[in-house]
């Protein structure tokens, strides 16, 4: 690997360790020429997963985008970031294990809501109100009634 400081093509690995729950490897390297130290990350190249939106628009799946939506729904709620990251990882893993190249956004939304309902009901309702585009208070009340039924 080329040194980012001097462009020499010889480096040696000083330290390697798994990161991101074993999904990638962090390597600490040193240039054999100038002794500059730098960090690299290695991960498996994944086949793109395409999300088909309600309007038919296609975009690449983004775990970060899903996480941002979850963080917004859980704002000022007692939900740890780690829980939200785990939800995103589980959903992505489940989608990739299906072996399909395209998935509908509705399916992802339902998967998120199922998991969110189990950890925080207020966050679930917040997410559902945006995801399901509640038009009026009656739709909101119906969603709350469904949530109460599921609890029993």
Curated annotation (Swiss-Prot):
The keyword Ribosomal protein does not apply. Negatively regulates transcription of bacterial ribonucleotide reductase nrd genes and operons by binding to NrdR-boxes. This is Transcriptional repressor NrdR. It comes from the Bacteria. The keyword Zinc-finger applies. GO terms for biological process: negative regulation of DNA-templated transcription. InterPro entries: ATP-cone_dom (IPR005144), NrdR-like_N (IPR055173), RNR_NrdR-like (IPR003796). Its cofactor is Zn(2+). GO terms for molecular function: ATP binding; DNA binding; zinc ion binding. A zinc finger (unnamed) spans 3-34. Binds 1 zinc ion.
């Amino acid at each position: 690997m080329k040194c980012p400081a001097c462009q020499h093509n010889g480096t040696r690995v000083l330290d390697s360790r798994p990161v991101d729950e074993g999904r990638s490897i962090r390597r600490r390297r040193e240039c054999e020429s100038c002794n500059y130290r730098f960090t690299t990350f290695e991960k498996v190249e994944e086949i793109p997963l395409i999300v088909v939106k309600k309007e038919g628009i296609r975009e690449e799946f983004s775990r970060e985008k899903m996480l941002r939506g979850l963080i917004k729904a859980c704002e000022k709620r007692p939900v740890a970031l780690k829980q939200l990251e785990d939800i995103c990882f589980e959903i992505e893993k489940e989608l990739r294990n299906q072996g399909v190249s395209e998935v509908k956004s509705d399916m992802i939304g339902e998967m998120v809501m199922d998991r969110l309902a189990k950890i925080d009901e207020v966050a679930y309702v917040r997410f559902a109100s945006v995801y399901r585009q509640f038009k009026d208070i009656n739709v909101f009340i119906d969603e709350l009634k469904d949530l109460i039924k599921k609890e029993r």
